[in-house]
Amino acid sequence: MNKPLPVTMGHSACPHDCPSTCALDVELLDGRTIGRVRGAAANDYTAGVICAKVARYAERIHHKDRLLKPLQRVGAKGEGGWREIGWDDALDLVAEEFLKAEARHGSEAVWPYQYAGTMGLVQRDGIHRLRHAKRYSGQFDTICTNMAWTGWFVGAGAMRGADPREMAKSDCVIIWGTNAVATQVNVMTHAAKARKERGAKIVVIDIYDNATMKQADLALKLRPGTDGALACALMHIAFRDGTADRGYLARYTDDPAGLEAHLATRTPQWAAAITGLDVEAIEAFAALIGRTQRSYFRLGYGFTRQRNGAVAMHAVMSVPAVYGHWQHEGGGAFHSNSDIFGLDKSEIMGTAYRDPSIRTLDQSRIGAVLTGDAEALCDGPPVAAMLIQNTNPANVCPEQRPVRRGLARDDLFTCVHEQFMTDTAGLADLVLPATMFLEHDDIYRGGGQNHIVLGPKLVEPPETVRTNHFVFEELARRLGVADRPGFGLTERDLIDNMVKKAGHTEGYEGLKRDRWIDCQPPFEEAHFLNGFAWPDGKFRFKPDWTGGYAPNRPPDSLGPQGPVAGLPVFPDHAELIEAADASHPYRLATSPARQFLNSTFAETTGSRSREGAPELMIHPEDAAREGLVAGDIVTIGNERGEVRLSLTVTETVKPGVLVHEGIWANTDFLDGEGINTLTGADPVAPFGGAAFHDNCVWLRGGA
């Protein structure tokens, strides 16, 4: 009879692309095997709660289809022919191909391409050290945060806000533009605590009746891309009804009189016509926050993934400034704490030898880059070699057809370092197997909360699997730059140096003992009661959209992006979205699925079985007009391509709006083309970004 394995408990942090960065307790069954993963109860933001997909992480780390050996392509790209190759030979091949590309076209012909498949600062960002040391093309990270961060920053002047734990002390929690039940479960933990202990109301604003909307006391379902109009109506009502805090406005904001005059025509009736909301619902929401000083606005990314997304974020975060909610514990607003952590990544990233004259390529425009668009290439050489880590561009990037066409080029060498045979890995010349987060050392910071969290190595990886850090280091040695600063150090060395530089004198060992560091600023700083982070200390209702610093401003060589002339002077609804027309009558949003995180977890049985299959939600009125019923196979399309999938008829969505949840593998769709076939890569004003939820399509029935 087999004895059960002894269980010990290890401590880590969730590495995935989620603002929560949950602190974790992990069952360790032996040196290579894990059991259940739980949220750390001792961490007062995680509060013992994590999402179901991470709780089932044993299913992923021990998956039968996990990549375990380096593979070299045999036959044509994408045909699926592979042969095993040793690690030394594989890395020799990468170095050889990089040097060939450099000899033919110069160093900029090599493009290391990465993103947030891990949020660990060492394993994610160390690729830049190799990039800068070798003068390879830079990457402008536009795919996720640009619209949201730009919109917040132009108002507040810093990326911080009210302590996210204060949601539990609020009397009204407004969850705007994020399906927190699916994507940020800890938001619901603290909002539910406020409801239980204080009788707080939960307001949810989104474009369809998702799981978070179903938990709301007041649910406002508006048309995609119209959040700014709702925000303006709320502020109009505040000035109209005397619930605007004029004393706060005079002390803390730049031009309240100009804003009030601007909003005179932004009535609830005006907003109702734009948003599709009832005037009564807008008035009720305004009355609630007008009488509730402790109103906490938790602002997500989803509503900013429109072509007017930066404008929408600025308009929405202006609301608590007009009402004066910032003055009260449990009030104000929060989007990201990315400014508070004080971690200097320069050694990890090798920024000391970054050359600003080297071109920077827009990651969201990878399709245009790889298919030779001169503007996307900054009028420079073609990209001839790539190392891709922590992302799956053939699946997650906009304008999927040119992305895949570019990756399939015979004259492009692509090495993909991955955990599974993703859509991108399937188009590579060389695939290297990567460790998972419990198999290496790293450090994390939670933009959606307030902690630096250590993720130490807890189990041994399979013998033939290697870390990102190993790949950077080995390529640096083969490419002749291993003597540069930052190379030759272990992950723990880099963590120790960075933590000590931030003032935590015990470094790695101290963090390992304590598990996390709480970096939340004092109340007055978090609530901007000492002034907003501009020289005059004023919140800016009149932002400088293009003239100042931004958290992710494009390099000067790229300049402002998108139709900047359409950006408004004051908070407003900007008509910059992809508007429906007679040829494309439906607005399509590609919303997150509960069981997936971008394209991660789409390979695990538990997540796949709970999600079912790719489906398209349509309102019954639209289905009846099109002569369609549930289960029909439909095609949706625009000038970027077409996608076939099954139909779900539901009042969850508004008439004229289609919703597809989750980034399924391309191969899960009937024609092998994923939902981002339909997503545009045109840059969003003012500093770029991908408008994933801002697409117009036609719809046709018939298989």
Residue ranges, per PLM feature:
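Long, contiguous, secondary-structure-rich segments that constitute the structural scaffold
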Residues: 468-514, 599, 604-617, 621-703
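Glycine-rich phosphate/diphosphate-binding loops that line cofactor/substrate pockets in enzymes
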Residues: 91-110, 163-172, 262, 283-296, ...
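Short beta-alpha connecting loops at secondary-structure transitions
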Residues: 214-222, 435, 450-462, 607
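Phosphate/diphosphate-binding loops
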Residues: 13, 403-404, 409-413, 417-420, ...
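Extended redox/cofactor-interaction regions of prokaryotic respiratory oxidoreductases
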Residues: 125-194, 198-205, 212, 228-232, ...
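N-terminal leader/propeptide and maturation segments of large enzyme subunits in energy/redox metabolism
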Residues: 73-84, 241-279, 458-540, 588, ...
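Active-site phosphate/pyrophosphate-binding segments
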Residues: 234, 253-370
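N-terminal export/assembly segments and adjacent metallocofactor-ligating motifs
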Residues: 1-241, 255, 278, 389, ...
